C-alpha cells in the first residue's frame, strides 16, 4: 500500500514539474523585441515619436529594442533629446544601421548598447553645420565634439573614431580618413574599430543574432498626427508656411472683405502651430502669446503711439521662436517670409498703386464738408447782412445784440467800441464776423 502511494506521489511530482516546464517555456516564447524606425530627417517630430515608442515598449514589457536607422541627419537639439531618451531606457537598445546613420544619425546610433549594420551600411560624416550649410561656430563645435566623445566612451567604444566623424582635424588614416577628411565607416570598418558587432542582412537575421529566435517582434508605427507633425516641422516646410502666412495677410490688407489670401495666411499659421504643438515643441502658452501679440497690434490701430504695436510685434516674434525646434531655422524662415512680404507690399503700393482697404473697415473716412452736403447745426447763415449793436467792445472778439439775441462775434480786425452799429459780413460755421458801419 505504501509503495502504491509512493508511486502516485512520484507521478504527481513528475506531472507538476512538466507543467512548470511548459509554463517556463511559454514565458520564454513570450519574449518581445520592439522595433522603432528612425528614418528621414532628425527633427523634433521624430524625437516625439521615439519618446512615445519607447514608452510603448516599456508598457509592453519588451525584452529588447531595435532602432532601425536610416537617416541623413538633422537638428542637433533633436538628436540630443533622442540621445537622452535612449540613455534613459531601462530596456537594452540595439542600433541597426540599415543603410545610413549619417551626421546626427551616427550620434544617435552611438547611444545604443549594441550596433549592427546592414551590408553596405554607412555611419559617420557628423560635422556640425549652421542653417546655411557652413561650419558652425567654435562654441557649437566644441559642444558637439564633447557629445560625440561621451557617446562613444559610455558604451566602451574608442572615442577617436567618433571624434574623427565630427572633426576633420582628427587623423584616422588607418580607416581611410586622413587629417582633413571626415570619417565615414562602412560595415567592415565599423567591425574593425569595434563600433559594430556584426552585419545582418535584415531585421529577422538581426533578431536571431541577438538570441531572440522565438521572440515576438512588434513594430512601432507613426500615427497620422505624428506623420503630419513631422512634415509640418520639417526645416524646409517651416519657411514655406510662414511665407504663405505673412504674404497672405499682407495681400489681405489690400482686399475688401475676407478673401482667399487672408484665409490662406490664417490656415498656414494654424498649420504651423498645430504641427509644433503635436510635435511637443510648443505649448498652449506659446499660442496665447501669439494671440496676445495680434491683439496688441490691433489696439495700436485704434490707440496709436508705437509702444503697444512694438510690444505686439515682439510677442508675435517671441512666440514663433519659442515654438521653433531650431533658432537658426526660425531666424532664416522669418527672414525669408519678411523679405517676400515686404517685396509684395512695395509691388502693390508703388508699382500697382493699390491702397490698403483693410483699415477702411476700421476707420471712418467720410469727410464733413459743405460740398458733400454736410451742414453744422451751429451754422448761422441766417444772420448774413443783419445789423446789430455791440454789447461789449470788440477786441476783436466780443458780444453784439442782433434781433434781441446776444451773439459772440469777432470784428473784421479793428477795435470796435461798445454801443456801435455793426453788420454781419461773414459766417463760417459758428464763427460770425462783423464790420462797424
From Swiss-Prot:
Q: Where in the cell is it found?
A: Cell membrane
* Pfam families given in the database record: NfeD, NfeD1b_N, NfeD_membrane
The record lists the membrane-crossing segments as 2-22, 231-251, 253-273, 288-308, 316-336
Give the membrane topology, semicolon-separated if more than one. Multi-pass membrane protein
Q: Which UniProt keywords apply?
A: Cell membrane, Membrane, Transmembrane, Transmembrane helix
Q: What happens when the gene is disrupted?
A: No change in localization of FloA or FloT.
A GO cellular component term found in this entry reads: plasma membrane
Q: Does the keyword Disulfide bond apply?
A: no
Q: Does this UniProt record's set of keywords contain Cell membrane?
A: yes
Q: Give the domain of life.
A: Bacteria
The family classification in the record reads:
Belongs to the NfeD family.
PANTHER family in alphabetical order = INNER MEMBRANE PROTEIN YBBJ
- Please identify the protein, giving its name as recorded: Membrane protein NfeD1b
